[in-house]
């Protein structure tokens, strides 16, 4: 540790960044070294350099704000007597033990046959008998009959459309004895048609399921007579019992810090306004491994606690060992603090919920003691790009039909989407911890899409899973552009394919087995559709290039002509269009019936629907190609990155669009040229597909523009109720996001090393509270020496994380950087300050400076 004399200019610069009075600053300016400075700050002149810099953490942190932190009882000491902030409640551990998966039904059967019992499962309760369970089963049998019946009729029509009618004219005895090529030529058209017919049946059944779901949702919302909706079980004004404590947990990972804490603050203030704040605690559960973002999170937590007086109510925890991703993050919370709460509400990084909505969820849980999870229907809002506004419009207009329809078919055996939902803690801890999937490869290891699995385990344990589809006050945001949405879809695709391994796990309810199946089909339908189109093109090439065989039997008197029934083709095409687009029309009819003012009026909402339909038709083939790639990547074991999606409005550059969509454009051109060469008249049928692929680059770029989205908003196109009459929670979120960006902390790790107060905050919030041990001391010295040697730009991520987590090493690095006047660190810090004039930790910034007004306010 250096004890070199302090340079006057560096000592003055150091003191200038502490909010001291003129008298205090003048008194400390007489120090001859930074070691002496920290000794005097700590009021301990006998302390060594290492002890002094650590002891000065408290004074550096509390200067000018000691009363605030002391009144909130936020200051404490660790086992070694070092100052720390009480950023989380005392840990009271609860046992969280995941049950190993037994996914191989053959192994289970073999063990039973050989007299070796399978491992016992944890005890589970039986969901009490209720009328809704019988009604739900009957409804689902009806849905299955409707889907299968509709698919059989459509398949019969499709069979009549295809030119080669069945295999009856193929002589199997003859093809065995004839040359292989002759067999291929004879069988090929029939094999193609059979494959096309099978694919058509699967895809049509998938479309049929969505149609009947939307139709029943339309009827539920139109009549308003759903006697099984869970929101009807509470009057909505019952007092919440003191023991019904609820933790609001927000798992985050390398997120947009200003937006995250703006939404958290808006939600906190709304809960406070509801009068039920004493029943809720808030937890930010960080898995961030970007040290700049981690430091920004620390500062944002301190700021939001100060602004809301939320000390002791808003907590922050950053994991050092990031296992099992988001599900592991929640497991860690449940293990440390879950036993102290009766309920848990999971928020996403972009979630905002009103206090009334959260209070209603707790009341519904209290009124339904057999409910394990109650999921709200989040409303998408808050984005301004043209793409995001069209998606917001689609989810806001069409989404309620599908959500109500899901509730109609599933009732208390429903979906959980991983956020904006309330969970009963005790059964969740006992039954919903997720073990890794056994085996090796892309579909083994930590479960990626945890939400569907947790819902299935909750129901298997004997607890209901409900959707409160009509509960207002639940909000989320959507990706701003197509490419960001596709990045998210890749993760979801891999996760849903992994989940299908649980399809045959013992004890799963049939509804949740179907949920696993629909999760797979959400993405597997893309390669199936692509294969259907490819085989259809191959059949066209077969009919065009291969000489047809009109006489396939000896002594055949009449030729066998390939058949074509255009009237059946038109009828089937029309039916498919109705199934795809009638739900959208029903959504608009429902808005007409309920009132269209909040959507811009009847004319504007209808025009918006037509434009959105055209846009969705343009994007469907593009998504098909990408999802096909994602499915192939998952099966081939290509890694799916888990980067957080873009949460802010962001346009797609032309260069990135060309890189991402260029292969699709070339595919569209080549496909169109091939079909035009084979049969130009068939190109009209394929034009919506190849045309969309050819236009994918400009559509992706243009739709990502914020200017076009705002222009559409000015014309009341794609208008949603949250834009017509913005709820207070969303207004507050926008305002706080704007303010947070104004004061956003950049280059956080350099600030945590160099800045006097930022270093104090980082040391006080560091979590590696080791005692004295020679190996630990040696490792600390090695890390500090490395940081001094290579500077901030040469420091690797693991060393950064280790330094940020260790209060002793971080404080020593801070002292050594200033004592040696290390230019590699201090120059970067100065540049950061010059580029970041609104940083909240600069005392030279006038405290009464006004906040910038919200743009557009």
From Swiss-Prot:
One of its GO terms (molecular function) is hexosyltransferase activity. It is an enzyme of class 2 (transferase). Its EC number is 2.4.1.-. InterPro entries: Glucans_biosynth_gluTrFase_H (IPR023725), Glyco_trans_2-like (IPR001173), Glycosyltr_2/OpgH_subfam (IPR050321), Nucleotide-diphossugar_trans (IPR029044). GO terms for biological process: glucan biosynthetic process. Disulfide bonds: none annotated. It comes from the Bacteria. The keyword Transmembrane helix applies. It holds the Pfam family Glycos_transf_2. Involved in the biosynthesis of osmoregulated periplasmic glucans (OPGs). Belongs to the glycosyltransferase 2 family. OpgH subfamily. This is Glucans biosynthesis glucosyltransferase H. It comes from Pseudomonas putida (strain ATCC 700007 / DSM 6899 / JCM 31910 / BCRC 17059 / LMG 24140 / F1).
């Amino acid at each position: 540790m250096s004890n070199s004399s302090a340079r006057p200019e560096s000592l003055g610069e150091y003191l200038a960044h502490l909010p001291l009075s003129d008298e205090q600053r003048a008194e400390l300016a007489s120090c001859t070294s930074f070691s002496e400075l920290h000794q005097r700050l700590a009021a301990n002149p006998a302390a060594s350099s290492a002890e002094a810099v650590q002891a000065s953490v408290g004074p550096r942190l509390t200067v000018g704000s000691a009363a605030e932190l002391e009144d909130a009882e936020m200051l404490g000491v660790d086992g070694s007597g070092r100052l720390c902030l009480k950023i989380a409640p005392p840990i009271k551990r609860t046992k969280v033990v995941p049950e190993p998966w037994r996914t191989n039904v053959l192994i289970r059967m073999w063990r039973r046959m050989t007299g070796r019992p399978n491992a016992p499962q944890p005890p589970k309760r039986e969901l009490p008998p209720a009328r809704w369970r019988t009604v739900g089963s009957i409804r689902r049998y009806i849905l299955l009959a409707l889907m299968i019946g509709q698919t059989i009729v459509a398949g019969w029509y499709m069979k009549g459309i295809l030119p080669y009618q069945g295999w009856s004219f193929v002589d199997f005895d003859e093809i065995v004895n004839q040359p292989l090529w002759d067999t291929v030529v004879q069988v090929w058209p029939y094999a193609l048609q059979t494959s096309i017919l099978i694919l058509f049946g699967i895809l049509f059944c998938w479309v049929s399921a969505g149609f009947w779901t939307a139709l029943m949702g339309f009827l539920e919302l139109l009549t308003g007579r759903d006697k099984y909706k869970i929101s009807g079980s509470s009057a909505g004004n019952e007092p919440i019992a003191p023991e019904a404590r609820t933790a609001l947990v927000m798992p985050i990972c390398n997120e947009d810090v200003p937006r995250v804490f703006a939404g958290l603050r808006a939600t906190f203030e709304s809960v406070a306004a509801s009068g039920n704040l004493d029943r809720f605690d808030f937890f930010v559960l960080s898995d961030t491994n970007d040290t700049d973002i981690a430091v920004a999170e620390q500062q944002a937590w301190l700021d939001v606690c100060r602004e809301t007086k939320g000390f002791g109510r808003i907590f922050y925890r950053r994991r050092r060992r990031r296992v099992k991703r988001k599900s592991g993050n929640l497991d860690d919370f449940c293990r440390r603090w879950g036993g102290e709460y009766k309920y848990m509400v999971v928020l996403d990084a972009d979630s905002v919920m009103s206090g009334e909505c959260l209070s209603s969820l707790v009341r519904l849980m209290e009124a339904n003691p057999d409910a394990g999870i109650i999921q709200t229907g989040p409303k998408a809002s808050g984005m301004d790009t043209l793409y995001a506004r069209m998606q917001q419009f689609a989810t806001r207009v069409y989404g309620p039909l599908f959500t109500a329809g899901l509730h109609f078919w599933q009732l208390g055996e429903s979906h959980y989407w991983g956020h904006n939902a309330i969970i009963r803690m005790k059964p969740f801890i006992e039954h919903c911890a997720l073990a890794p999937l056994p085996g090796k490869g892309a579909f083994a290891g930590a479960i990626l899409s945890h939400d569907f699995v947790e819902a299935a385990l909750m129901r298997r344990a004997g607890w209901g899973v409900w959707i409160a589809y009509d509960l207002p006050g639940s909000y989320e945001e959507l990706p701003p552009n197509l490419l960001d949405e596709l990045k998210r879809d890749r993760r979801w695709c891999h996760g849903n394919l992994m989940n299908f391994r649980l399809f045959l796990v013992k004890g799963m309810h049939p509804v949740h087995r179907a949920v696993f199946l629909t999760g797979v089909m959400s993405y597997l339908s893309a390669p199936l559709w692509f294969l259907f189109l490819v085989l259809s093109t191959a059949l066209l090439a077969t009919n065009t290039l291969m000489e047809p065989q009109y006489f396939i039997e000896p002594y055949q008197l009449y030729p066998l002509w390939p058949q074509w029934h255009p009237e059946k083709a038109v009828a089937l095409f029309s039916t498919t269009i109705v199934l795809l687009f009638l739900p959208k029309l029903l959504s608009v009819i429902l808005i007409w019936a309920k009132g269209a003012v909040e959507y811009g009026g009847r004319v504007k909402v209808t025009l918006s629907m037509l434009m959105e339909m055209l846009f969705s038709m343009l994007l469907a083939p593009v998504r098909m190609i990408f999802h096909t790639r994602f499915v192939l990547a998952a099966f081939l074991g290509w890694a799916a990155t888990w980067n957080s999606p873009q949460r802010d409005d962001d346009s797609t550059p032309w260069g990135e669009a060309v890189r991402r969509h260029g292969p699709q454009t070339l595919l569209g051109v080549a496909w169109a040229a091939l079909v035009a060469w084979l049969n130009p008249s068939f190109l009209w049928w394929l034009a919506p597909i190849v045309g969309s692929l050819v236009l994918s680059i400009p559509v992706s770029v243009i739709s990502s523009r914020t200017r076009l989205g705002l222009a559409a908003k000015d014309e009341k196109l794609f208008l949603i109720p949250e834009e017509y009459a913005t709820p207070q929670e969303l207004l507050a979120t926008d305002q706080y996001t704007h303010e947070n960006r104004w004061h956003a902390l950049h280059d956080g790790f350099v600030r945590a090393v160099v800045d006097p107060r930022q270093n104090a905050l980082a040391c006080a919030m560091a979590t590696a509270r080791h005692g004295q041990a020679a190996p630990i001391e040696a490792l600390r010295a090695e890390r500090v020496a490395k940081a001094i040697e290579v500077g901030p730009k040469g420091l690797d991520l693991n060393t950064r994380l280790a330094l940020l987590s260790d209060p002793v090493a971080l404080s020593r690095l801070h002292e050594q950087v200033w004592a040696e006047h290390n230019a590699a660190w201090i120059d970067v810090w100065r540049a950061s300050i010059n580029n970041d004039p609104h940083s909240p930790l600069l005392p030279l910034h006038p405290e009464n400076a006004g906040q910038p007004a919200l743009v557009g306010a």
